[in-house]
């Protein structure tokens, strides 16, 4: 077993400083944020994907620290009812997947997302109670019309 940490706990520090602190604490692995609510304080996938030099520098910095990546974190809401927000979170996820491939990281942590309660929704809304019966219609919409189709498409 290895001890890891979600690297965003030190998002106010430069990557090198954060890695040094983690190493001094006995941490062996990190889960850096790559977008969404996790932010991109230490890893900006679009920058690393666009620049082989930046990617190489990141890998060298990580290797020099003695730490490894357990997973990449991208906790957004790609099914947000606001199409602009949904697209931004979707792009973060796509870039995180591409970066994981480049880094040889086989795990990404994310949120499935929270759609609205109908096509006209402006805000995410998740039903937590099975009654009244209208709530079951909302859940059916969220699962059958939004979440399942989104993730089936994303997986391809």
Positions of the model-derived regions?
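Extreme N-terminal starter segment of soluble prokaryotic enzymes
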Residues: 1-4
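Active-site beta-loop-alpha junctions enriched in small/polar residues
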Residues: 6-10, 33-37, 74-77, 113-115
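Residues that form or flank phosphate/diphosphate-binding pockets in enzymes
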Residues: 13
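Catalytic domains of carbohydrate-active enzymes, especially glycoside hydrolases
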Residues: 16-38, 103-107
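Active-site acidic/histidine proton-transfer and metal-coordination neighborhood
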Residues: 17, 56-57, 61-64, 78-156
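Conserved beta-strand positions in the central sheet of alpha/beta enzyme cores
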Residues: 31, 71-73, 109
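Glycine-rich, proline-tolerant flexible connector loops at the mouths of alpha/beta enzymes
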Residues: 32-59, 113-119
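Short hydrophobic interaction/assembly module
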Residues: 51-73
